[in-house]
Amino acid sequence: MPFITKISTQKKNTERFNIFLDEKYAFSVDADVLVRFDLKKGKELDELDILEIQYGDDVKKAFNRAVEFLSYRMRSEKEVRDHLKKKETPDMVISEVIHKLYDYRYLNDKEFAEAYASTHKKTNGKGPDVLFRELKAKGIDDDTIKETLSAFTFDEQIQEALKHIGKILKKDKKLSTKEIRQRAQMQLQRKGFPFDVINAALEQTEYENDDEAEMEALKAHAEKAIRKYRYDGSYESGMKVKQYLFRKGFSIDDIDQFLQEEE
């Protein structure tokens, strides 16, 4: 069986050591592995010893890689597993690393889910449906997700939905009443709010235009339609403009009134 004849520190990484067996380089190990296996000059190693040492070093390297990955932000177990797989880490090593991360409390899917939901609810205004899908994609189990999102009360969801509607009303002033409602519904659905929350939020919102605002919105759209369809007072071009404005949510009476004033 070979003996350790030399141990030297690596130049680029002083936490790693080169092991020489019978005067020939054999492998390198982390400082922790060196201590754990009591590697020193003159120690005899058989084949099984070497395999065990190398496996221990693989675990240590993967663990360090995982800790670095976790240093940027909280991660779910699945995110860490996927990261290590991309680095071609063997499944057995990954499983041991995950176990160690839980032991050190570096991983906790419940705490991760709570932090993720809280952050994205506040910063991105996401609703529970989107949060559920995103947490599911990150490997969080259904029970944990449901428990996490149960803290997002119905009233809180309505308040978040109202913020989105407020932004739409502030930004898009030249919209018909129908368009405002449709745009708000679509935006809230994309953000992951359920229909009962959307309807409740819309009921609490004064989004209907007064007559003057509605006519201003109609005028803005009509000017686009007149240019687009080259309105010249003819029946054909008039119908195209009317259809366009009707699809935008304006009433026939308001459309006719506007076109009559244009003639």
From Swiss-Prot:
Entry keyword set: Cytoplasm
Subcellular location as annotated: Cytoplasm
Tagged with keyword Cytoplasm: yes
Entry's Gene Ontology cellular component terms: cytoplasm
Top-level taxon of the source organism: Bacteria
Main location: cytoplasm
One Pfam assignment: RecX_HTH2
GO biological process, one term: regulation of DNA repair
UniProt keyword annotation of Calcium present: no
Signal peptide: none
Family of the protein in this entry: Belongs to the RecX family.
Function description: Modulates RecA activity.
UniProt cross-references to PANTHER family, sorted A to Z: REGULATORY PROTEIN RECX FAMILY PROTEIN (PTHR33602:SF1)
The protein's name: Regulatory protein RecX
Organism: Bacillus velezensis (strain DSM 23117 / BGSC 10A6 / LMG 26770 / FZB42)
